[in-house]
Curated annotation (Swiss-Prot):
This is Coiled-coil domain-containing protein 40. The keyword Transport does not apply. Belongs to the CCDC40 family. The lineage of its organism: Eukaryota, Metazoa, Chordata, Craniata, Vertebrata. Pfam families: BRE1. It comes from Homo sapiens. Residues 63-96, 265-274 have a biased composition (Acidic residues). Required for assembly of dynein regulatory complex (DRC) and inner dynein arm (IDA) complexes, which are responsible for ciliary beat regulation, thereby playing a central role in motility in cilia and flagella. Probably acts together with CCDC39 to form a molecular ruler that determines the 96 nanometer (nm) repeat length and arrangements of components in cilia and flagella. Not required for outer dynein arm complexes assembly. Required for axonemal recruitment of CCDC39. The modification Phosphoserine is found at S252. Its main location: cytoplasm.
Length: 1142
């Protein structure tokens, strides 16, 4: 079937089949701005697309009744819809409208199609037009216009009537116009069977269509489209413009007049249909391609993102499960090891209990041994007189000393090993505890992480389901949520401000309430005092009114005393206020001093513990020093001939001297710290005592002032009563005097004369008693002299017996101390040997473990360094690739801009050529029907302007749809970020619940503060008790410290004496052995000749001189060791001064 000439001249490729240029245009639309994208898309699609025309049949009558015409030229064939795509440049230029220039020279575009059928003879200007176009230089244009013969033959229409292709408005969603319908109805009245020649029609449409394309491009690039409020979201694309433009042909004069009448009839209907029709595009519509592509890309990105997140979550869950299983296994092993350690701890407790019981038994045995020692003291005194017994005992002791020295050396080694083993066990225990805590913390972290991952999985599933919802509903939900969040945040701020203001108000109210209560108490106290004074004054006034005139002087005196007492009361009140303020300050200082005292007590306890440890270390070092001195003497006596031993001993002496200096300096520092702490404690305790005394004195002063006020008030009332009583007594005594005088007959004997007589009698009696007392005193003095003589004799005998007893007790104590020291040394040596063996074993194990751990750490460090370098190189490669891509994109953008500029330049050239062709055409055409042609041109111009506006609106709406997709992505990302920041939006009910919980917590905190105040008061009482007990213990400690210092001095003195005696005993024993060997003839001379003996003597003297110089140098460098080295240097000097053998 032939193709109609005006309606649907060409159809576009089906199923979106396009060339590679079209695909590149679609792909590049994401990287450039919308104007650049549209122009580039036009150019590439025009060059690369292929053309596949189809024949379409339409129903013109149904379209005329509905009054709608397709603006994009889409054909609906019996309810079926076809996909629309772009044609190449040849078909695009053939489909454009014919265009005429207005008197002002403006170029306009038409909105609707005009299917006219005119015979070939109605176009008289065909040859002239062809010659003009050829002379104007339109060679490239004619090459495009003259296509292959197959394409031109397809454009020849059939004799059947052809109309514009129409379709229902509900399916296609396009806006129709009234004039188009009128022209279409007018075209149906033309005779059928008229066909326009192919070549003329083709060339005519080609020239004007290119002009339309250039004008549309200039309008699109220069202006920014504005979306009117009544236009729907979908508009036809510019790429579909050739479908409309293919339907316009050159009308005849009769057809022009008919079209003008139809336009006048339908101009009123166009305005009504523009705002009333709501356009809804079908999903398969070609205008929806860009929006669907953007939405598809967005959804694909979301799906890929969710897939990656899901894969990461699956991998993380697998790893967490594996780690959890491994942690369970490790936890079980650690628990088993902990049970084993607990068993070992119980066994060690049992061993400790057994050792304590054995110690008690040994102490009991020691007491029994002491009892036996008292019995054997008498026998020991008798045996001392025997020289042979003493010699045998000396030999045994020397042998024992030799053995003990060897054992001592072994025990020292064992002690070192045991200390190292103990340290190792302690470190292993601490490390096991730390590892257990870390494992518990890691298990908790993994559980929380697993829960969080499960929540994230559920959240991602919900997000995946929510992606299918509509964008409009999501936007509304987000806006509502934002408004709710803003309202909640505003309400939260308001409530927090109210809460802060209420707290401040409560504080001010409490302060004002306290001030009012204090003022009320003061006023009540003053009112009571004034009431008491008023009542007292009323009573005194009533009594004074009842008295007579004789007591007026007494009344004046009492009034003056009352005024004085008032002054005293006011002074006492002022003193009381001042003392109350002082009391508060003292109480605060007392609290500060108590806090400082508690801190000092803690520091004192720590320092006492350190002091005990240092003293123990000092004792150990002293014992080591003694043993090393003895070893040095023995080594000097035994190995006088070896030079290596002398060097070793010199090094040993230097090392011991350094250790001794370090220990002495450390001891002096600790003693200084202890003295400083004791001074601080005494200072704080003295301050505390002074504050307590002042507090007690102030309390007593307050009590005294109150008692003085009450006593003064009672004294006033008591004195008034006493005055009355004395007045009555005076009257009574006057009456008695008168009566006595009357009885004596008028002679008055005074009471003094009677008293003189009575006293004279008493004097006589006392004189007699004094004589008797003198006699008895003399007798008692004689007896007392005899008793004192006897007492002096008894005291002399008692002193002699005490001296004898003291001597015996000292002897007893000396022997007991020697026995106890020997036993203690033996036990310590055995214990040290065992400990040193264990320490040596543990030390070896620790060294092996440390070596293995260090190797593992080095390997791990190497692996981590390699991984870090590898990741760094990969990231550098990625950055280089991204930089290259960015450079490529910038170059492509620049090339596209250059192509766009060139295309615009070509468009301007074509416009000039078209203008020349139009001028030639206007000169060729006749003047018949110029009025109708001008009217038609005006209408065409108006429709072209309308078409440009609609195309701009269409492009604007397509961009809005694409931006909506992008906006949706931004909204989802913002929602995800907000959801991560705040998982749960706070509502009014949640806020109310939280407020109730906070109030409940505040009540609990207040209760807790009350309980804390009670406990603080109790602790203060206990602190006072503890401070008093601490003072007592400090006094006891000072006494014990003094005793300890004296005992330590005695111990050092006795130790030096013991070492001296032992050295003398060893020397005497060796001398005795040599003498016995000489006596028996077994002695072997070391030096056979006298000359060798002299040489050996000289060598030894040189070595002694060298040792003496070394000792002098050490004494100069280390003055703290002068006392210890003085004896050694003195012995060496004596040896050097002694003459050699003759």
């Amino acid at each position: 079937m032939a193709e109609p000439g005006g309606a649907a001249g060409r159809s576009h490729p089906e199923d979106g089949s396009a060339s590679e240029g079209e695909k590149e245009g679609n792909n590049e639309s994401h990287m450039v701005s919308p104007p650049e994208k549209d122009d580039g898309q036009k150019g590439e699609e025009a060059v690369g697309s292929t053309e596949h025309p189809e024949e379409v049949t339409t129903q013109a009558e149904a379209a005329i009744e509905e009054g709608e015409v397709e603006t994009e030229g889409e054909a609906a064939v019996e309810g079926e819809e076809e996909a629309v795509s772009y044609g190449d440049a040849e078909s695009e230029e053939e489909y454009y409208y014919t265009e005429t220039s207005s008197p002002e020279g403006q170029i306009s575009a038409a909105d609707t199609t005009y299917p006219y059928f005119s015979p070939p003879q109605e176009l008289p200007g065909e040859e002239a037009y062809d010659s003009v176009s050829g002379e104007a230089g339109l060679q490239g244009f004619q090459q495009e216009a003259t296509g292959p013969p197959e394409s031109r033959e397809r454009r020849v229409t059939s004799p059947e009537p052809s109309h514009g292709v129409l379709g229902p408005s509900e399916q296609m969603g396009q806006v129709t116009s009234g004039p188009a319908v009128g022209r279409l109805t007018g075209s149906t009245e033309e005779p059928q069977g008229q066909v326009l020649p192919m070549g003329v029609q083709h060339r005519f449409r080609l020239s004007h269509g290119s002009d339309i394309e250039s004008s549309d491009l200039e309008e699109f690039v220069s202006q920014e489209p504005v979306i009117p409020p009544g236009v729907p979201d979908a508009h036809p694309r510019e790429g579909d413009l050739p479908v409309f433009q293919d339907q316009i042909q050159q009308p005849s004069t009769e057809e022009g007049a008919m079209a003008e009448r139809v336009e006048s009839e339908g101009s009123d209907e166009e305005a009504e249909d523009e705002g009333s029709q709501l356009v809804v595009l079908d999903p398969d519509h070609p205008l929806m391609v860009r929006f669907q592509a953007a939405l598809k890309n967005y959804l694909n990105r979301q799906i890929e993102k969710l897939k990656l997140d899901l894969q990461e979550l699956v991998v993380a869950t697998k790893q967490s499960r594996a780690q959890r299983q491994e942690l369970g296994v490790n936890l079980y092993e650690v628990q088993q090891h902990l049970v084993h350690l607990q068993k070992l701890l119980e066994k060690s407790h049992d061993r400790h209990a057994m050792a304590s019981s054995e110690r008690r038994q040994k102490e009991e045995e020691l007491q029994a041994a002491r009892a036996l020692y008292t019995k054997t003291c008498a026998a020991a005194n008798e045996e001392r007189k025997k020289l042979a017994a003493l010699q045998t005992e000396m030999e045994n002791l020397a042998l024992h000393l030799f053995y003990m020295q060897n054992i001592d050396q072994d025990m020292r080694d064992d002690i070192r090993v045991m200390t190292q083993v103990v340290k190792k066990a302690e470190t292993e225990r601490i490390r096991a505890e730390i590892e257990k805590k870390k494992q518990d913390l890691y298990v908790d972290q993994l559980t929380t992480r697993a829960q969080q991952l499960e929540e994230d999985i559920a959240l991602f599933e919900a997000q995946y389901l929510a992606q299918a919802e509509d964008t409009r509903i999501l936007r509304k939900a987000v806006s509502e949520a934002c408004t709710e969040i803003d309202a909640i945040s505003v309400e939260k701020r308001r409530i927090m401000q109210q809460w802060a203001s209420s707290l401040v108000g409560m504080k001010h109210r409490d302060e004002a309430h306290r001030a009012v209560l204090e003022a009320l108490r003061g006023c009540q106290h003053q009112a009571k005092s004034t009431d008491g004074e008023i009542e007292a004054y009323k009573k005194s006034i009533m009594k004074e009114e009842e008295k007579n005139e004789k007591l007026a002087s007494i009344l004046n005196r009492t009034e003056t005393e009352a005024t004085l007492l008032q002054k005293l009361t006011t002074q006492c009140l002022t003193k009381q206020v001042a003392l109350q303020s002082q009391f508060n300050t003292y109480r605060l200082t007392l609290q500060d001093t108590e806090d400082a005292l508690s801190q000092d007590q803690l520091e004192q306890m720590i320092l006492t513990e350190e002091l005990q440890a240092i003293r123990q270390a000092i004792q150990g070092e002293l014992e080591l020093r003694r043993k090393t001195d003895a070893a040095i003497r023995e080594k000097l006596q035994e190995h006088m001939t070896s030079n290596k031993t002398t060097k070793y001993f010199n090094q040993l002496i230097l090392r011991l001297q350094k250790e001794k200096t370090n220990m002495m300096t450390h001891l002096s520092k600790i003693n200084g710290d202890i003295a400083q702490t004791t001074l601080d404690i005494t200072h704080t305790s003295s301050r505390l005592d002074a504050h307590q005394k002042t507090l007690v004195e102030l309390d007593q002063d307050v009590k005294k002032v109150n008692e003085l006020i009450t006593n003064s008030q009672s004294e006033i009332s008591r004195r008034t009563i006493l005055i009355e009583r004395k007045q009555g007594l005076i009257n009574f005594l006057n009456k008695q005097l008168e009566r006595m005088v009357s009885e004596l007959g008028g002679e008055e004997v005074g009471p003094l004369e009677l008293e003189i007589k009575r006293l004279s009698k008493l004097i006589d009696e006392h004189d007699g008693k004094a004589v008797q007392a003198q006699v008895t005193w003399l007798r008692l003095q004689q007896e007392m002299v005899k008793v004192t003589q006897e007492q002096e004799e008894q005291l002399a005998s008692l002193d002699a017996s005490k001296k004898e007893l003291h001597i015996m007790e000292q002897k007893k104590l000396r022997v007991e101390s020697k026995i106890e020291q020997e036993k203690k040394e033996q036990k310590e040596i055995e214990h040290h040997m065992k400990d040193l063996d264990n320490d040596l074993k543990k030390l070896n194990m620790l060294m092996n473990k440390n070596r293995c751990s260090s190797e593992e750490l080095e390997q791990n460090n190497r692996v981590t360094e390699n991984e870090f370098v590898r990741s760094l190189k990969a990231s550098e490669r990625e950055t280089i690739k991204m930089q290259d891509k960015l450079n490529q994109l910038s170059e492509e953008k620049a090339t596209l801009l250059n192509q766009l500029v060139e295309a615009e330049h070509q468009i301007m050239l074509w416009e000039k050529k078209i203008q020349l062709a139009k001028e030639m055409r206007s000169s060729v055409d006749s003047e018949i029907g110029q009025t109708e042609i001008r009217a038609m041109k005006g209408e065409i111009h108006r429709m072209k302007v309308r078409l440009g506006q609609l195309l701009k609106q269409q492009e604007k709406m397509i961009r809005a749809m694409e931006l909506a997709v992008a906006r949706r992505e931004t909204v989802t990302t913002q929602a995800e970020g907000q959801r991560k920041m705040d998982r749960k939006a706070l509502t009014r009910t949640d806020f109310h619940h939280k407020q109730l919980e906070l109030r409940r917590k505040i009540r609990d905190v207040r209760k807790a503060t009350d309980e804390c105040t009670k406990t603080v008061l109790e602790l203060e009482e206990t602190q006072r008790n503890v401070s008093s007990s601490l003072l007592e213990k400090q006094e006891k400690l000072s006494v014990i410290q003094a005793d300890f210092d004296t005992l330590e001095a005695d111990l050092t003195r006795l130790g030096a004496l013991k070492r001296q005696n032992l050295s003398e005993i060893v020397a005497l024993q060796t001398r005795l052995k040599h003498l016995q060997a000489v006596k028996e003839g077994r002695y072997v001379f070391l030096f056979r000749s006298k000359q060798s003996l002299v040489l050996e003597r000289q060598r030894l003297d040189k070595r002694l001189a060298l040792i003496a110089t070394i000792l002098d140098r050490v004494r100069d460098e280390y003055p703290q060791f002068q006392e210890a080295l003085h004896k050694v240097s003195q012995m060496i000097a004596n040896k050097l001064e002694s003459p050699g053998p003759s």
